[in-house]
């Protein structure tokens, strides 16, 4: 009998290895078919979701809770190993990860011997820490990437601009303005910002003016006639014929930390506005029926929902589609386009998506992390006189299923729209 058992275990281990090799082969094949950028984007999504669950896992273990499983992927098991009381492994569908913490609700049946180590028996601060750990991980990743971008890449210097492009045959071309030149003044008026420059030029149609240029540290004075452009309202505005390029300004550690924190707060606020604007009755009905989405409350970024839906607004996308909700497929295509545009653009994509996933998971409804936060807070408020109140999880089942159904419907509609009419990301 022992020999049969040992042989069975060896056969199962061999099957695990075969399935794992097949998964690796499938991933490599996807990279060859979808290209390196597609593989990088999908891998980034998986890593983000694994880090989310890793946050829950680490905090639960540090809090003394029993964690029985930590798996990457879903579906059939490909490989697993048991270390202590936790089974670690990989499953066939690399769509994220999950952690199984004992006693997450009052409905879970638990061995009385480990009841004291369940999630439901822990103190309010410990339960809050575990529930918030996933979103906190996304926020930490976003802040770290923001800090890196400002230190390594920088931000556009608001006090300086140079010529980034010159229109052929324009007034600028007539005096040999070149890319990289700095326009110091027009008609004796200094132009510290491109917006200031535009205001000045638009008010000088057909006028002969003096222009001071700076090239390679040397200044030169030129005289030119400002071009003319007919505006929509019938007025004539001045036209110079240049586009701006704002030099990047790298920041030191302190400045980068301050800038990253301020930008992070802005992104959180925009994500909240976007979620509130979308998950209103009008917003949902408009989306599910294929109508135009309201731009009110929309945010330039991504918001992740159940089934992996992401709301995107990007300057490179057609305005009609810029507030459109994308499925995970559409988001992957967008990420690939951003990666093709350069690593800096792709880092901003990762920053935005991490912030939005973190915020979305704090929505106070099960099965999202925010639902566990709401339940823990409700139980804390109801627990008086030293008596612990435990919420009746059976009452939450209908609401939970309603939320899941809504999120699945949104994800399916978003996927359908992306398949039949995916926006052109360039």
Regions found by a protein language model. Give the residues of each.
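Final/C-terminal transmembrane alpha-helix of multipass membrane proteins
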Residues: 26-29, 397-418
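Functional transmembrane alpha-helices
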Residues: 13-16, 117-118, 122, 229-357, ...
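Conserved PDZ fold ligand-binding element
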Residues: 172-194, 264, 399
């Amino acid at each position: 009998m022992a020999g049969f058992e040992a042989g069975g275990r060896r056969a199962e281990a061999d099957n695990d290895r075969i399935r794992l090799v097949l998964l690796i082969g499938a991933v490599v094949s996807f990279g060859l078919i979808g290209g390196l950028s597609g593989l990088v984007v999908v891998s980034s999504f998986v890593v983000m979701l694994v880090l989310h669950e890793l946050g829950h896992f680490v905090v639960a273990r540090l809090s003394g809770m029993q964690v029985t499983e930590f798996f990457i992927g879903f579906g059939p098991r490909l490989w697993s190993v048991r270390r202590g009381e936790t089974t670690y492994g990989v499953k066939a569908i690399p769509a994220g990860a999950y952690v199984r913490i004992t006693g997450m609700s009052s409905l879970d049946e638990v061995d009385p011997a480990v009841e004291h180590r369940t999630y439901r028996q822990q103190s309010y601060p410990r339960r809050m820490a575990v529930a918030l750990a996933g979103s906190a991980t996304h926020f930490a990743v976003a802040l770290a990437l923001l800090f890196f971008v400002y230190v390594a890449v920088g931000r556009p210097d608001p006090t300086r601009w140079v010529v980034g492009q010159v229109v052929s045959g324009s007034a600028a071309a007539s005096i040999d303005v070149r890319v990289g030149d700095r326009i110091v003044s027009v008609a004796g008026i200094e132009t510290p910002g491109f917006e200031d420059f535009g205001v000045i030029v638009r008010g000088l149609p057909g006028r002969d003016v003096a222009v001071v240029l700076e090239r390679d540290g040397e200044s030169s004075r030129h005289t030119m006639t400002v071009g003319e452009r007919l505006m929509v309202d019938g007025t004539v505005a001045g036209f110079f014929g240049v586009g701006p390029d704002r030099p990047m300004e790298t920041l030191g550690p302190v400045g980068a930390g301050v800038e990253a924190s301020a930008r992070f707060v802005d992104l959180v606020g925009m994500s909240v506005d976007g979620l509130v604007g979308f998950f209103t009755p009008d917003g949902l009905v408009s989306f599910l029926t294929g109508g135009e989405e309201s731009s009110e409350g929309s945010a330039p970024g991504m918001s992740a929902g159940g089934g992996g839906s992401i709301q995107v607004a990007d300057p490179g996308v057609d305005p009609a589609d810029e507030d459109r909700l994308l499925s995970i497929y559409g988001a992957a295509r967008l990420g690939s386009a951003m990666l093709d545009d350069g690593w800096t653009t792709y880092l901003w994509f990762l920053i935005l998506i991490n912030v939005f996933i973190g915020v979305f998971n704090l929505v106070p409804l099960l099965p999202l992390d925010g639902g566990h936060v709401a339940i823990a807070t409700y139980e804390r408020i109801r627990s008086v006189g030293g008596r612990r109140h435990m919420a009746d999880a059976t009452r939450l089942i209908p609401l939970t299923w309603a939320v899941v159904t809504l999120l699945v419907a949104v994800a399916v509609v978003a996927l359908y729209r992306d398949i039949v009419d995916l926006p052109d990301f360039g």
